[in-house]
């Protein structure tokens, strides 16, 4: 049907709209809200692959007579219309729930198992089959009419159930392995922090100084300017460079900054950069620049620290990145409700730290760096295994929908036969008319005043046109 491949015996291609009923949810319109019927509803963000997170639900006004139209019932498949198109999950809760227009409600007919469709849409999304049905250049959308055109390889219903059974058995094992990998990755991150803590315990007895006593020049905020496509623009870091500790072209942008104004903001090796504003978890995040001099400037949300010869910049960076440093900045960050918490230069200057000899500082830096490299190797292997798990999942789904996962039973009713029956049943059903909105009565306009001196008799009045009733827009 879609020209992709030949199907196994007993299978058939069918457009989704021919084997399932689809409907979009209610459009969110705060202007029309009366506040009389607040109803929890599902949004795009609530629907993930194979699961629905209903812990954070918004509410909107839905009239009682609309609830049947804009709710999902137990067993319905909910499909994302935008963003990651095709992402879907089954509503398995007895109580119905409303849903927004960013979601499709799909109710398969008797020839299509809901779980089979759920896994097929995952396969179609991961393999790129859904892209040609999407609209939009930046944020992709899957309009209802396009969703209904998606071709589905349809095995006999009994075979669909066998496919789902094997998929769930194998995927549950794969999911358990992935959960274990994620747990190990979390412990690897913990090892980084532990390694730093152990190394820094060796300098607890050293004399302490304020960071303000260890700088060779005043702290400096950066400068932010509008981005430009001009290749001769000023390369400027973004916050991600410091958050990730990765100073690359990817984490910069070219800006229209005035070269004269930013002449003192070019980075040099050993510059320490501290985020002066970010989320509560990230404010105070620190990284040291180790690249070539004059490669980029830094933005206003970063504060540059240049230390004197009493301390190694690598050592100071470790102290600021430690649990003690992170806790210090979080505790002193200030911000109004709804705004990003901030720290200022004095907060950084007043941070106290142990200052051992340069020889001890270097030993600490080398010890932490060696441990970090070992942890990074472990983390890299875990990432590689995680990517392999994605490949295994995709391969399993591909095998299933190529008809190679389970055996074909000649006793099963062929999909073509079942499709013909469903088509005949649908044709025999009377077409239901869509409800129309009630016409709004309009007050008659007052007649225009007659001219003071009318010439000749007044013309006969023309019949008023009938009031048009707009048919309800198909959501």
Name what the model sees in each region.
Residues 1-26, 149-164, 169-221, 350, ...:
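Non-catalytic DNA-recognition/assembly elements of restriction-modification systems
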Residues 17-32, 45-74, 212-226, 240-272:
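Sequence-specific dsDNA recognition surfaces
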Residues 29-37, 132-134, 208-209, 224-232, ...:
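Short coil/turn segments at secondary-structure boundaries
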């Amino acid at each position: 049907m879609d020209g992709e491949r030949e199907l196994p015996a007993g299978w058939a291609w069918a457009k989704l709209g021919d084997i399932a009923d689809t409907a979009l949810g209610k459009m969110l319109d705060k202007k029309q809200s009366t506040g009389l019927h607040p109803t929890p509803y599902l949004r795009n963000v609530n629907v993930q692959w194979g699961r629905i997170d209903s812990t954070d639900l918004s509410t909107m006004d839905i009239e009682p007579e609309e609830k049947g139209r804009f709710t999902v019932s137990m067993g319905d498949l909910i499909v994302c219309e935008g963003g990651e198109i095709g992402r879907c999950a089954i509503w398995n809760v007895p109580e119905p729930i409303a849903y927004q227009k960013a979601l499709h409600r799909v109710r398969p007919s008797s020839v299509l198992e809901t779980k089979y469709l759920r896994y097929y849409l995952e396969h179609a999304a991961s393999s790129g089959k859904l892209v040609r049905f999407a609209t939009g250049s930046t944020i992709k959308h899957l309009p209802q009419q396009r969703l209904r055109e998606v071709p589905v390889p349809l095995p006999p219903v009994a075979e669909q159930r066998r496919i789902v059974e094997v998929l769930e058995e194998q995927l549950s094992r794969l999911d358990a392995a992935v959960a274990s990998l994620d747990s190990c990755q979390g412990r690897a991150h913990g090892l980084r922090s532990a390694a730093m803590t152990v190394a820094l315990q060796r300098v607890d007895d050293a004399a302490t100084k304020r960071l303000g006593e260890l700088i060779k020049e005043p702290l400096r905020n950066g400068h932010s300017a509008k981005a430009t496509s001009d290749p001769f623009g000023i390369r400027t870091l973004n916050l991600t460079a410091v958050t990730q500790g990765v100073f690359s072209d990817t984490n910069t942008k070219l800006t229209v900054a005035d070269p004269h104004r930013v002449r003192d903001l070019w980075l040099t090796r050993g510059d320490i950069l501290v985020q002066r504003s970010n989320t509560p978890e990230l404010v105070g995040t620190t990284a040291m620049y180790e690249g070539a001099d004059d490669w980029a400037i830094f933005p206003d949300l970063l504060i540059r620290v240049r230390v004197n010869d009493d301390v190694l910049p690598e050592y100071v960076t470790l102290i600021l990145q430690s649990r003690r440093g992170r806790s210090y900045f979080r505790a002193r960050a200030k911000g109004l409700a709804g705004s990003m918490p901030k720290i200022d230069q004095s907060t950084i200057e007043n941070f106290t730290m142990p200052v051992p000899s340069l020889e001890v500082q270097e030993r600490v830096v080398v010890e932490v760096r060696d441990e970090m490299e070992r942890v990074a190797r472990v983390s890299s292997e875990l990432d590689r295994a995680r990517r392999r798990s994605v490949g295994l999942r995709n391969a399993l789904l591909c095998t299933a929908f190529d008809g190679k996962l389970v055996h074909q039973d000649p006793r099963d009713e062929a999909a073509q036969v079942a499709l013909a029956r469903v088509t005949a049943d649908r044709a025999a059903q009377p077409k239901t008319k869509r409800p129309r909105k009630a016409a709004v009565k309009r007050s008659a306009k007052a007649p225009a005043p007659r001219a003071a001196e009318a010439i000749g008799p007044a013309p006969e009045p023309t019949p008023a046109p009938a009031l048009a009733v707009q048919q309800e827009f198909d959501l």
